[in-house]
Each structure stands twice: as C-alpha cells, then as structure tokens.
Amino acid sequence: MLIPSKLSRPVRLDHTVVRERLLAKLSGANNFRLALITSPAGYGKTTLISQWASGKSDLGWYSLDEGDNQTERFASYLIAAIQQATNGHCVTSEIMVQKRQYASLSSLFAQLFIELAEWHRPLYLVIDDYHLITNPVIHESMRFFLRHQPENLTLVVLSRNLPQLGIANLRVRDQLLEVGSQQLSFNHQEAKQFFDCRLSSPIEAAESSRLCDDVAGWATALQLIALSARQNNSPTHQSARRLSGINASHLSDYLVDEVLDSVDPATRQFLLKSSLLRSMNDALIVRVTGEDNGQMRLEEIERQGLFLQRMDDSGEWFSFHPLFGSFLRQRCQWELATELPEVHRSAAESWMAQGFPSEAIHHALAAGDANMLRDILLNHAWGLFNHSELTLLEESLRALPWESLLENPRLVLLQAWLMQSQHRYSEVNMLLARAEQEMKGEMDPTLHGEFNALRAQVAINDGDPEEAERLAMIALDELPLANFYSRIVATSVHGEVLHCKGDLSRSLALMQQTEQMARRHDIWHYALWSMIQQSEILFAQGFLQAAWETQEKAFQLIHDQHLEQLPMHEFLLRIRAQLLWAWSRLDEAESSARHGVEVLSAFQPQQQLQCLALLVQCSLARGDLDNARNHLNRLENLLGNGQYHSDWVSNADKVRVIYWQMIGDKKSAANWLRQTPKPEFANNHFLQSQWRNIARVQILLGDFDPAEIVLEELNENARSLRLMSDLNRNLLLLNQLYWQAGRKNDAQRVLLEALQLANRTGFISHFVIEGEVMAQQLRQLIQLNTLPELDQHRAQRILREINQHHRHKFAHFDENFVERLLTHPEVPELIRTSPLTQREWQVLGLIYSGYSNEQIAGELAVAATTIKTHIRNLYQKLGVAHRQDAVQHAQQLLKMMGYGV
C-alpha cells in the first residue's frame, strides 16, 4: 500500500513569494529531457517547483525518503506518479510493478515507454529529494530512463547535490535545464516581498536588502529572521547579525536558541516526537504525541511558521521541511532518548492501523521491539513476500532472535523461502534441519508438509530428483487440501521428477493438474511453469503441434498476467525457437531466440547460454559457418565461466559437435570426447541428447562400432519410453553412421523410418544439418519414386532446404572443375566436341541440386525465359531429353571425377 503523501505535490502556501524570474526560466522546461534543481537545504527548491507545477494536470510528483533505495519501492512509487500524471494510462506497467513481474528497473521503464508512446501531450515527472538515493542500481536505471524517455516527457529532479545521472552528456546535447543555488538565492526585491508578508510591520527596502545580503539570499535564514523577530518581538537586524555567514552545517545551535527554546514545552515535545514520522496525519499525531486533535495541532504549527508543510491538496498529510526535520530528529535522540522506543512503538501501531505494514516495520525496528516486529511479520510477512519486499523482510528476520523464530516456525519457513528465491539451496536445508532439531514439542503435520514441499523444490533445483520425489510425496500426504500453495509446489515437483525419469504420460497429467490448481488460486508463475513443462513433454513425445498449441496458451497467459519480464518467459521463447527450428522456420526461430536474450538482458550473461546455442543452431542449419563460429566464440566463453545444469551443457555441446562435424575438426572433437563424462542413464531427453553428442563425435572420428552400440541403446530406451522426437534424431545419426561405414542398405532402412516418423514430428532441420550425405540419399530415394506421398513430399522439402542453405553443393561445376573434367581421359566425346558454357555448367549444377527453374532464375538473377534457353541448350549438348536424365548425367560426371554420390 502506497503512502498518499509521497505522491502529492506540496500545496502552494498563501504567504510564499512567487519567484517570477525563475518561473519564466522554467516555462520552457518541456523543451528539455531533464530539469535539474540543485542547492543545499533551505533554498526553496520544492517551493519553486510546486509554484511551477501549479495548474499543470499532466504532472506526477514523487517525494523520496531513505526507504526508497529499495528498488521495488522506488519502482512502485515512480509508476504510481506516472499513473497520476496520465490518469491511469500505463495499465500494463502498473500491473507489472504491483505484481513485481519485471526483470529490472530498466526493463520496467522500457515497458513504460512503450505505453507512453501513445501519450502525445507534454508530460512531467517531478522527483524530490533525489540526494537520498544511494543505490547504484537506481542511478543506472534512471540514466537508462533519461536516455530513452519519450520526447514529450520532462523529468524534473530536485537534489542537494549533482545526481549521478549523466549530467555532462545531457548538458553537451543541450537537453538539460539547470537551476542552482545562486539562482535560487533571493534577490533584494524577493526579500522585501518575503518580509512584507511575514512581519506585522513592514521594514525599509534598504534594511531588507541588507538582511538579504547578510545571509546571501538563503531562504531558510530569511524565514528564521522573520520567525525570531515575531517570537521575541525583537528587531530583525539582531537575528540577521547572528545569522550572517551561517550555513546549513552550523545551523543547529541557532535553531535550538531561536526556535526550540522560544516555544512552550508542550510544543517542543510535539515537534520532537512528531519529527520521527517521515509523513504524518491526524491519526498518527494523536497516537504518537497524545494530542486530542492532531489535525488542529498540525495546522497550528503550520501557522506558526515552524517549517511544517502540507503534502496534499486535502491538507490531510504533512511533513517537516527536510532541514528542520533532520535537526528535530537529532535533538530527539538527545532529549527523549528514554522515550524513543515507546514513541516508535506508538508510530508502528498507528501505521498498522492505517494499513501500512512496511512503515510499521520501520518503526518496530527503530524501537528494537522484537515482539512487535514478530507480530507484524506473522500477520503481513507473506503479503510482503508476494510483493517482493525481500530486502525489508531479510532485515526484519535478522533482527529477530533465533528463539523467536523457533517459537513461530512459519517465520522460519518464510526465511527459508527467501533463501530459495535467492538460490541459496544449501542454506535452506541447513536452516530447516536446525529448526526441526531445536524446536520444542512435536511439529504440526501441516507445517512439516510445508517444510517438505520447500525441501522438494530445493532438491529438484539442485539436481537431486530422487530426494525431490521422496519429499514431494511425503508433503502431499501431510498437506490438507486447503494448503493450496504448498500442494501446488509439491505436485509440480513430482511432475518434474517423473519428467526426468522419462515417465512422460504421468508427468504430463501432473503438470496439467498443477496448471489447474495454480490458475484456480492465481499462482501465475507456477501456472506458466507447468505449461512450459507440458510443452517440453509433448515435444519429447513427438506431438509438436500439441506442444505448439500449449505454447500459444502460455504466451497468452504471459500477456494476460503481464509476465513478460519473468525469466520463465525466456524459457518459453527458447522452446518455441527449438520447435520452429525443427520445422525449418529459421527466421522465426532466430527471432524467438533473440527475444529470449532480450528478456534476460538484466540477468547474468551466463543465463543466455541456451538462446545463444539456438542462434548457433540456426546458423548451422543455414550453412552459415562464419556466423556460427562468431556465436560459438561467445558460447564457449560463457561455458568456461559458469556452472550449468547438465541439460544446458548438452545443448551447448550439441551445436559445437555439429560444427566440428561440418568443418571436419577431429582434433577438437577428440579433445571434447576425452573430457566429457558419460551419463549413467539415457532415460530422458536431456540424457539422450548428451549420448547423441558422444555418438556423433565417435562417428566423426571413425569409431563406428562404439557409436552403433550407443545409438542402438538410445533407440531401445526411446522406443520403450515413447521418446519419439529423440528416436527421430537417433535414427538420423544412425543413418550417418551406416552411410559412412558403407552399409548403404542399413542406411536406407533407418532413413525411411526417420522420414515416416517425421510425419508425426514435422522434423525438417534435423535432416538438413546432415548436409550433402543426406542430400545424396534423398535424391536416390526420390529417383526411385517408391516413397509414400507424404514421405516423398517431405524428402523434396528437405532437399530444397539443403540446396537453399548449403549452396556449396553445386560448387563442383565451377571453372576449375570444368577445366579438369574436359581433360579427363574418360570424358564423353559429346561434351568434348560440344562444350557447355560456364553459365550452362552452373545451371546443370543447380538442376542436380534439385532447384526448380524459378529457383535457378532467382539464384543466378536472370529471367526465367533465359533459364529455359540455357536448359534447352545444355539438354541438346548432353543429348538428354528430360530433367531426370540431366541429373543422372551430372551424377555420372561427378562419380567419374571421384565424388561419392
């Protein structure tokens, strides 16, 4: 819940001096990206900007305090201020910040700017007291904000110092409007106006000018002169003499003598106690100070000019001038040291009564009251956890003694979930084990079930499926149906374990159950996770169309619940890219992988490994080895600088091994094989993939017998577990083995099975990456004209893809080849006496590669009619009448020249 006063522009007071000369300068603020108002405390920054903002409707105001260094809190208030300025225009950004569904502040701002692109009126965002921000993450994010904000948005920043926002760059580009302390200082005319509206009897212009010069136009000093003169009924020049040459760092003594010592004891107590509140209203004042009418007392203090300012138009919320508030809090530490804990307790109780647990925790911590802090956490901690107030929760839990956590084991559970969210898996188990060991009395079965559900999640995350399954099953036995969150966790873990074991049908059913429960209770991240798992399972079973449809539902969930910036979005984009790649929709696959990289841009680079492997895979399918090598360089760098799940390593190794196969790099392949551990089993698609990598390297090295043993065992497991996509991949690799070993009949047998299975999986690119060897076999099958219609159609499609992306296949008919061919002793006499032109040789090569007339015309960039002429000429010279005859003739020439076709 947001405190309204932090989003309210200060009310313009009746007795303030209108700074006409500065307002004139600020009138052109909409022409700048940043308006920066800097000066020490007390120069009137906030008052000036509140005057300038008066009458502007498309303006949001955000008043900072020390607590805004938490990135989640900063994001919440900043988006709320924008919503205030735009009358709720940025709905998606608001939902994302409320649900903490963004990867970083910068990515949240990127979404904000997408929505603001449809906002065409001038827009202003004021951030007051920016000097309180010390978090470098926020500074960096605000630099991003300034670089990318829409042209019609002006950011107005008020600060006591130059903020770390890339000011120099903005200044050079003339995108910065600056107002500093020299300009903020009152001139003689403004000082005269100030005294005229503050003092009962006017003073001479010469005297007001002298007073102004004595304090160098410092607004706070002028206010103190007027206040002292009123309270002590003394001449203004006496106060001026005392203030002459003074600055903010030496102001404390003056404020004690001239302000605190000049008010009655009750007012002094009121000022000191209320200063502990960062913002205040009637209810808070009544509870903290004991006043009967807090609102009336606040208004009275305001009338006395004691540096109290209204924070909203309704006059409900107030705050002290920052300079005076800081002074009062310091005095409070000295004068009310023994009362402070009780005052903070009262403040915490009042904030709780008004529904602001975060503020209540702030005061409970300041009071050092562990019992109060415990009670607040017991009632509100899970709500704060679900809103990602993780830093505040960690600080709070650290402040509680261990005994208090043991007496309230749900707080132990909360601390453990905090550790789990930060991937501190070993600490989770240590904490829970210690708690169980030291807890007095028998643990409640439901709580024990919650402990075990969390332990199960930790175990599966840590790569221990056996332990994860054991704990998940115990948890499901212990947890009542009403304990939906932990039951969702345990069910999800059980489904994931079965996935790892290759029990795909049962895993799919459990993941569908998880999705239903998660949707029913709005636990959207588990709903998304379960749908991603369903898609992976369906893909492994060979049901790629069903996997696609599940992905579509998952993308819709992401859109509906604004989950675009969760890391799981990248997971979905990645498996979509894998599916698109399988279907040879390479441009879409690459786009999806790049989108995945963008989603992870705010995370460690190592997280991008899988998407990077997919980019390599797309380049390999296109035959673009240079681009593949560029991506591989980065991928191998990431591999050497991180620890990864075996599935991630397997996917990265897959593209490396295929690349080595394509360029014939046996040395790298052999080194990899020596260093790569062999998985113990092959009962899921993760392990099948790594064994396939091993077999591919063995084939490359000519070790056909061990490779055949591996692939036959993989096929046996794949058939048994119904891992149909893996079976399809295994058959293609076995085909390569048989072909290279000279076992052509076996090669054709497994290729026919792979083609038939591809009618279910839709695989195209898995055939394409095998290159010319695959193309030669497919040409032979097509020439035999014995394939079933669907298989024939797929074979032709695969051949077209190979021809399109592996253009070097027709390089046999280049000039050097033709020159050697014509001098070959066995060259047909017809070719020797009636040689083809270079262009006709190119056309023959493309015909052999399976190109249609239109494709040949496109490849050679000539008209289709020209190609027909070339074909007619070369048919005549070769003595053939049909296209198939030309293909066979080209094949004979290649065999004669020693090419295996």
UniProtKB/Swiss-Prot annotation:
Transmembrane segments: none annotated. PANTHER family: DNA-BINDING TRANSCRIPTIONAL ACTIVATOR DEVR_DOSR. GO terms for molecular function: ATP binding; DNA binding; DNA-binding transcription factor activity. ATP binds at S39, P40, A41, G42, Y43, G44, K45, T46. Signal peptide: none annotated. Activated by ATP and maltotriose, which are both required for DNA binding. One of its GO terms (biological process) is positive regulation of carbohydrate metabolic process. Residues 829-894 form the HTH luxR-type domain. It holds the Pfam family TPR_MalT. Positively regulates the transcription of the maltose regulon whose gene products are responsible for uptake and catabolism of malto-oligosaccharides. Specifically binds to the promoter region of its target genes, recognizing a short DNA motif called the MalT box. This is HTH-type transcriptional regulator MalT. The keyword Ribosomal protein does not apply. Residues 853-872 bind DNA.
